[in-house]
């Protein structure tokens, strides 16, 4: 499987046994001015969701592009 991986947000072949791509987003102290933090990568299983963290998992090549945020009006 190939997934986008941060920090460079470039497509990389996942290590053996890691066939899941994930997109993890969460708020930190700068969330209101910079938007949510984003972490992209490969995993063997979909990571456990923690409070305040949103995780999306998928299993096709490059299915985890960097999220596009809507501008606030």
Curated annotation (Swiss-Prot):
InterPro entries per record: Snake_3FTx, Snake_toxin-like_sf, Snake_toxin_con_site, Toxin_cobra-type
GO molecular function: acetylcholine receptor inhibitor activity; ion channel regulator activity; toxin activity
Lineage: Eukaryota, Metazoa, Chordata, Craniata, Vertebrata
Name listed for the protein in its UniProt record: Long neurotoxin 1
Tissue: Expressed by the venom gland.
Subcellular location: Secreted
GO cellular component: extracellular region
Keyword Transmembrane (UniProt): no
SUPFAM superfamilies registered for this protein in UniProt: Snake toxin-like
Keyword annotations: Acetylcholine receptor inhibiting toxin, Disulfide bond, Ion channel impairing toxin, Neurotoxin, Postsynaptic neurotoxin, Secreted, Toxin
Coiled coil (residue ranges): none
Record family assignment: Belongs to the three-finger toxin family. Long-chain subfamily. Type II alpha-neurotoxin sub-subfamily.
Positions of disulphide bridges: 3-21, 14-42, 27-31, 46-57, 58-63
Source organism of the structure: Ophiophagus hannah
């Amino acid at each position: 499987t190939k997934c986008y991986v941060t920090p460079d947000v470039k497509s990389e072949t996942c290590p053996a046994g890691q066939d899941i791509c994930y997109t993890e987003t969460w708020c930190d102290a700068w969330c209101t001015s910079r938007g949510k933090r984003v972490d992209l990568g490969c995993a063997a299983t979909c990571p456990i969701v923690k409070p305040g963290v949103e995780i999306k998992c998928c299993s096709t090549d490059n299915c985890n592009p960097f999220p596009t945020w809507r501008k606030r009006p």
